[in-house]
Amino acid sequence: MSEKELEERVMISKDQFLEIEKYLQENFHNVKTIFQKNRYLDDKNMTVKKVHNVLRIRSFRSCKMRELTYKVKGQDGDIEYNQMLSHYWFYQITRDSRFPEGCVKEQLLKDGVDLSSIKLLMELYTRRMEVKIDNYLFVLDTNLYNGICDYNIEIESDVSKKHAKEIILKYCEKFGLTYDENYISKSRRAFNSLNKN
C-alpha cells in the first residue's frame, strides 16, 4: 500500500516541548502516547540515503507486528510504501537480507537498491504524543538516537501540504517557534549524527 504524506514539521527546544506538552494535556482529552522504534536500513552502496529516501522497520510497544516502510522523497509530499511484517520476516530482512513480496520490495528494486546487501544502520526511538484536531493530526515527538535527544512538532493534514503549512505556522506564532523550509527529518538527523562519530 502507498500513501502520500501531507505534513510539515518544526524543531523545538526542550522548554518549548514542555510548554506544548502542558498545552496538549490541559486542552485535549484524546491525546494518545505512542512509543515506537525505527530501524533504518540501506544497501552497501547507501543507495537509499543518496537519493534522500528512507527504508525503515517500525515497531510499536503496543503490538507485535512491525511495519516495513520505504519513503520516497516527493515535491508535494513524500510517498510511503508500507506493508506489515511478521516476526519471521523481520528477522529475514535484518539477518539474511531477504524481503517479502510486496510494494516495498517492488519499489526498492525499481530504484536499483541491492536487496542482497541490506544491513541495519541504526535505531531511533520516539515517544509520540498525538491528538486529532479537525482535519489534521497534531504530533509532539521526543526522539532518541546515537546518544542525542531532540524534539519536534508535526502537523499531518488530511487536506494538503499547503494546509499543513498553514496550520503549523499558526502554532509557530502561538508558541514562538521558528519555521524552517529546510527542516531536516529525524532520520536524516540520525544519519548525520553517525557521520560525526
Model regions and ranges:
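Phosphate-end processing signature that detects enzymes handling 5′-triphosphorylated RNA
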Residues: 1-197
